[in-house]
Structure formats: C-alpha cells, structure tokens
C-alpha cells in the first residue's frame, strides 16, 4: 500500500533521510519511531509529495509519486499534522472546510456520524457550536480525527496524534484508530509514546 525505495530527503545542505526503504501493507497500523530530527515527519510528508525528495521512489497504492500523480495520491490520504493550524473562527467552519475537500456537504446525516465519532473520542457534540479559540490543542487533535474519518480515505498519515493528550484522551484516540484499522484503513503515525507503539502492528524505525 505504501512503499519507499532507497529515498533520500534533503533540505538545502541537510540530508534527513538517506537511502531509506520501507513497505507498509494494506490494513497495517504502523508507528514511525526514532530520535528527534531523524526524519519522521519528513517521511510522512514524502508520501504526500510535501518533502524535497532528492532521490528514490515513493509509492502510494497504485501510484508512483510524481508531479502528475500527487493530486490522485492525496485523494486517497487523510493527513493530520502535528502543528495543526486552523485559520477559521468557529469549529463549524473548520468542519465545512474539510468536508469540501471530500466534496461533502454538512447535513443532518453527516452531523450524526460526526457526533458518533466525537463521542468515541471522548468529546461532546456541543463542541461543534464553539469557537476554535475556546477548545484546547488536545481537543483540536481529537476533533480533527473525527472530521477526517468522514472523508473515508484509505490511508491515514498522522504526525504525533497523541502528543498533546493526557492518558485518558490518548486511549480514546488509540481505540478510535484501532477501530479504523479493523475497517481496513492503513494508518501510519509518528509517535514517541511506547504504549501507543506497542499497540501498532508494525514499527518503522528511523
């Protein structure tokens, strides 16, 4: 499902990955681990065509990454960055933005599914009526996971999805991701959390 073949990623004169290869089969829940600065986030971005690929090959599903296939690849992927910047005033506006990416409209049925997902992540549906400034970073992370699931993408790429969470909230996220894996999703997540990684089906060590 996801594959890199001898890739190198370089920012200016700094090479963060050199000759790296990996393979993630469909339906795998994989955790990327390694020391700070070793290229974990860059690897996630490489699958989206967002990292400066110096050499090597990246494949997502049936596509080999190129300027011609980036758009098709991104339509298969749900991406949650670690530093989540949402340039909107309200939670509702953020939801509508994500839904537009998937050509979806916010209606009663979408709200019903979204509220179910929020509950699974330990969040109340009244969060949908709040301003973004009123919710914490950890709530934003969980809220965005609930929204991204509406897009029904085959691949989930997550950068430190539990970093800002307490133990209880972290466990909500892990349970939610394991449920997505059972539904056939392929999940690749960066994490420093030993408990999180212990529940994954594969480890990508950098």
What are these regions (language model features)?
Residues 48:
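Helix-to-loop junction immediately C-terminal to a conserved catalytic motif
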Residues 131-135, 139:
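Conserved ABC ATPase signature
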Residues 108-127:
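Conserved ABC ATPase "signature" region
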Residues 52-64, 73:
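Conserved ABC transporter NBD signature motif
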Residues 167-169:
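Helix N-cap at the start of a conserved alpha-helix in ABC-type nucleotide-binding domains
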Residues 89-104:
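Q-loop/switch helix immediately C-terminal to the Walker
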Residues 156-160:
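Catalytic Walker B motif of ABC-type/P-loop ATPase nucleotide-binding domains
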